[in-house]
Curated annotation (Swiss-Prot):
<dbReference type="GO" id="GO:0036305">
    <property type="term" value="P:ameloblast differentiation"/>
</dbReference>
<dbReference type="GO" id="GO:0008083">
    <property type="term" value="F:growth factor activity"/>
</dbReference>
<dbReference type="Pfam" id="PF00019">
    <property type="entry name" value="TGF_beta"/>
</dbReference>
<feature type="glycosylation site" description="N-linked (GlcNAc...) asparagine">
    <location>
        <position position="197"/>
    </location>
</feature>
<dbReference type="GO" id="GO:0008284">
    <property type="term" value="P:positive regulation of cell population proliferation"/>
</dbReference>
<dbReference type="GO" id="GO:0005125">
    <property type="term" value="F:cytokine activity"/>
</dbReference>
<dbReference type="GO" id="GO:0001837">
    <property type="term" value="P:epithelial to mesenchymal transition"/>
</dbReference>
<dbReference type="GO" id="GO:0061036">
    <property type="term" value="P:positive regulation of cartilage development"/>
</dbReference>
<keyword id="KW-0165">Cleavage on pair of basic residues</keyword>
<dbReference type="GO" id="GO:0009986">
    <property type="term" value="C:cell surface"/>
</dbReference>
<dbReference type="InterPro" id="IPR001839">
    <property type="entry name" value="TGF-b_C"/>
</dbReference>
<protein>
    <recommendedName>
        <fullName>Bone morphogenetic protein 2</fullName>
    </recommendedName>
</protein>
<dbReference type="GO" id="GO:0060317">
    <property type="term" value="P:cardiac epithelial to mesenchymal transition"/>
</dbReference>
<feature type="modified residue" description="Phosphoserine">
    <location>
        <position position="85"/>
    </location>
</feature>
<dbReference type="GO" id="GO:0045893">
    <property type="term" value="P:positive regulation of DNA-templated transcription"/>
</dbReference>
<dbReference type="InterPro" id="IPR001111">
    <property type="entry name" value="TGF-b_propeptide"/>
</dbReference>
<dbReference type="GO" id="GO:0043410">
    <property type="term" value="P:positive regulation of MAPK cascade"/>
</dbReference>
Amino acid sequence: MVAGTRCLLVLLLPQVLLGGAAGLIPELGRKKFAGASRPLSRPSEDVLSEFELRLLSMFGLKQRPTPSKDVVVPPYMLDLYRRHSGQPGALAPDHRLERAASRANTVLSFHHEEAIEELSEMSGKTSRRFFFNLSSVPTDEFLTSAELQIFREQMQEALGNSSFQHRINIYEIIKPATASSKFPVTRLLDTRLVTQNTSQWESFDVTPAVMRWTAQGHTNHGFVVEVAHLEEKPGVSKRHVRISRSLHQDEHSWSQVRPLLVTFGHDGKGHPLHKREKRQAKHKQRKRLKSSCKRHPLYVDFSDVGWNDWIVAPPGYHAFYCHGECPFPLADHLNSTNHAIVQTLVNSVNSKIPKACCVPTELSAISMLYLDENEKVVLKNYQDMVVEGCGCR
């Protein structure tokens, strides 16, 4: 059975058995269930638990996530989801971001631990140490890239003035500071000269460091983010390059601009993230019997199975399903294989041989944004979730 079809059956069956399938079963199916001569039996809790575990396993989860209500989804991840699901409202295309996502099917985001240490604020520079706990990065996942996102805010004084510049340097800490050595031993990873005439996120490549920490077993001592103030007073730059939380800043506003580490990886399953586009019909619809094999509407609503508290987006999706007869002789529009044609021919003279079946012949992926068991925000591409075409096989 095709993986995507099996996934949908697992999702639909408990809903059908429980009689709560209003949002998951097409109208025709609901009428059939409503008119059944005997009531449906209620499955045991063990059966329902097994169904849920199988579906969670397909998502790569060991248990159902139960995130707290205080978890904030970074705006960067929401925009990344919009980009790759083809939704309006996404920011302008970012070629560097597109390149990173083109080799990955999983994106993870991490906030730094708040107990950061201000290393120095002298000689026109402000430095801070950032530590990101990467223990939840899957060991069996191939890391394709990693980026540190730093937000910089617009300065009114910088409008029309290119002299308001800062240099942001990102270092990997090779050896932390000790009692005998005041400063850590570091390695430069990336650097950027920025102006403060606009508000935007700056992306820095930290792939080598994250690769050493996650794949090569090196100790993660964190990063040093250094802001060099060019022709500026340090205090002004410190407020506008957001590497620390303001004294009276509330949790929500800080969550919108706090630094973010993003990893791009591939688990070896399916294709990389891509922008989903609406497919055009390959040929005009021909006259066909109402009962012939074709695609039918089916909308899967995650709130119907109580998963809308950890699946951020989409709220549901159009999965579709295949249903209908494969009559003899098989017409061209039924998208049949030679084997199906032969099987149908034999069935016409020998009823012991079953007819060809109406099944999905083409499936596509969807992107999902969700919170995992560790309350980490994940963007992942799942294969074989949408039926694009049906045929007799």
